[in-house]
């Protein structure tokens, strides 16, 4: 039996101060039900960064994984764009 494809998200690294961990902010646009206007919503995820390569301001892709700690359930897949 084939395992289903893991969910991936693209977001901005907001913090790289922890050892082998980065905080990634994912921003989505959602249509407001009453006013029919798009509203920005953001959520923060803790992601595992094995080589400590991501820096604050980088755009990264993260994927779901098994629980790695109390708050970490995502891992860094690739750095899409480096911070300037």
From Swiss-Prot:
Disulfide bonds: none annotated. One of its GO terms (cellular component) is cytosolic small ribosomal subunit. Keywords: Ribonucleoprotein, Ribosomal protein, RNA-binding, rRNA-binding. It holds the Pfam family Ribosomal_S17. CDD domains: Ribosomal_uS17. It comes from the Bacteria. The keyword Protein transport does not apply. One of its GO terms (biological process) is translation. GO terms for molecular function: rRNA binding; structural constituent of ribosome. PROSITE patterns: RIBOSOMAL_S17 (PS00056). InterPro entries: NA-bd_OB-fold, Ribosomal_uS17, Ribosomal_uS17_bact/chlr, Ribosomal_uS17_CS. Part of the 30S ribosomal subunit. NCBIfam families: PRK05610.1, uS17_bact. Belongs to the universal ribosomal protein uS17 family. One of the primary rRNA binding proteins, it binds specifically to the 5'-end of 16S ribosomal RNA. This is Small ribosomal subunit protein uS17. It comes from Treponema pallidum (strain Nichols). The lineage of its organism: Bacteria, Pseudomonadati, Spirochaetota, Spirochaetia, Spirochaetales. The gene is rpsQ.
């Amino acid at each position: 039996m084939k395992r289903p494809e893991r969910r991936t998200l693209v977001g901005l690294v907001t913090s790289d101060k922890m050892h082998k961990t980065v905080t990634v902010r994912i921003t989505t646009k959602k249509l407001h039900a009453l006013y029919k206007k798009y509203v920005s919503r953001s959520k923060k995820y803790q992601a595992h960064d094995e080589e400590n390569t991501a820096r604050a301001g980088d755009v990264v892709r993260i994927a779901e994984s098994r629980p790695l700690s109390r708050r970490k359930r995502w891992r860094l897949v690739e750095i899409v764009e480096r911070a300037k």
